[in-house]
């Protein structure tokens, strides 16, 4: 029976005090609905092709001297080359893949984005809100999947899709 199946991530079953009916609430997106959520959806919606209209991602950004704003909360003036930034990114990817480090701790320690304070979490976003290469990579990832190096005007990113 469908009611016995596990709910998608973020969803919980609640009882309406006013109507006495069961409804479903997503504590990540704050969405609520009467119908049981299906599949891997976290309330982010799907377009007509079954693609999500919103995703949630975390990232680790390494800026370099050619970044559009070569400074960060970690360093006032970033002087590393693009090649050095890519070496750092590839090193972080290896540490994550080997299990030596987890994504969130590396993002909080080494990301040049202020989202480091949130362990790299950028929250949910729709198409058109991020730089195109970042957006394309984010929407191409499956939930729980990590990207390789993604190049934008901001620098080089590792992206982890969380929803």
From Swiss-Prot:
Chief place of localization: nucleus
Domain PpiC positions: 52-163
An example molecular function term from Gene Ontology annotations: cis-trans isomerase activity
Domain of life: Eukaryota
Residues with PTM N6-acetyllysine: 46
Ranges where the record places region Disordered: 33-54
Reaction catalyzed: [protein]-peptidylproline (omega=180) = [protein]-peptidylproline (omega=0)
EC number: 5.2.1.8
Domain notes for this protein: The WW domain is required for the interaction with STIL and KIF20B.
Record-given protein name: Peptidyl-prolyl cis-trans isomerase NIMA-interacting 1
Organism classification: Eukaryota, Metazoa, Chordata, Craniata, Vertebrata
């Amino acid at each position: 029976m469908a009611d016995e199946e596990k709910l998608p991530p973020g969803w919980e079953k609640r009882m309406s005090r006013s109507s006495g009916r069961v409804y479903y609430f997503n504590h990540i997106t704050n969405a609520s609905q009467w119908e049981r959520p299906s599949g891997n959806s976290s309330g982010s919606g799907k377009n007509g092709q079954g693609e999500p209209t919103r995703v949630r991602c975390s990232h680790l950004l390494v800026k370099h001297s050619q970044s559009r704003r070569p400074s960060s909360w970690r360093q006032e003036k970033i002087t590393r080359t693009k090649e050095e930034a890519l070496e750092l990114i590839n090193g972080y990817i290896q540490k994550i893949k080997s299990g030596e480090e987890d994504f969130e701790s590396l993002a909080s320690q080494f990301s040049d984005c202020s989202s480091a304070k949130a362990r790299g979490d950028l929250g949910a976003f729709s198409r058109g809100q991020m730089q195109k290469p970042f957006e394309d990579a984010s929407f191409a990832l499956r939930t729980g999947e990590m990207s390789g190096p993604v190049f934008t005007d901001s620098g080089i990113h590792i992206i982890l899709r969380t929803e």
